[in-house]
């Protein structure tokens, strides 16, 4: 095997731009900045909003029923 062909693998700190959370991991990059992390992502925090599709389905069924009667 050839020696010294792989990039240097260092410990880096990942910083969230949104909430400021940081953690240490290993990477070939000198630093990592992420837009959103698990501390502030709506899916992980439970603040996820659910789209109301029931109203849309009812509206479609009303339109479809009108066209079926005609």
From Swiss-Prot:
GO terms under biological process: translation
Pfam families linked: Ribosomal_L31 (PF01197)
Source taxon at top rank: Bacteria
GO molecular function: rRNA binding; structural constituent of ribosome
Keyword Ribosomal protein applies: yes
GO cellular component assignments: ribonucleoprotein complex; ribosome
Keyword terms of this UniProt record: Ribonucleoprotein, Ribosomal protein, RNA-binding, rRNA-binding
Known role: Binds the 23S rRNA.
Family note: Belongs to the bacterial ribosomal protein bL31 family. Type A subfamily.
Subunit structure: Part of the 50S ribosomal subunit.
Protein name per UniProt: Large ribosomal subunit protein bL31
Organism (species): Chlorobium chlorochromatii (strain CaD3)
Gene assigned in the entry: rpmE
């Amino acid at each position: 095997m050839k020696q010294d062909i792989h990039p240097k693998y260092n410990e880096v700190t990942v910083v969230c731009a949104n909430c400021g959370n940081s953690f240490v991991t290993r990477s070939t990059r000198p630093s990592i900045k992420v837009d959103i992390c698990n501390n502030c992502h709506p899916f992980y925090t439970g603040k996820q909003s659910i789209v109301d599709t029931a109203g849309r389905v009812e509206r479609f069924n009303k339109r479809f029923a009108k066209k079926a009667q005609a």
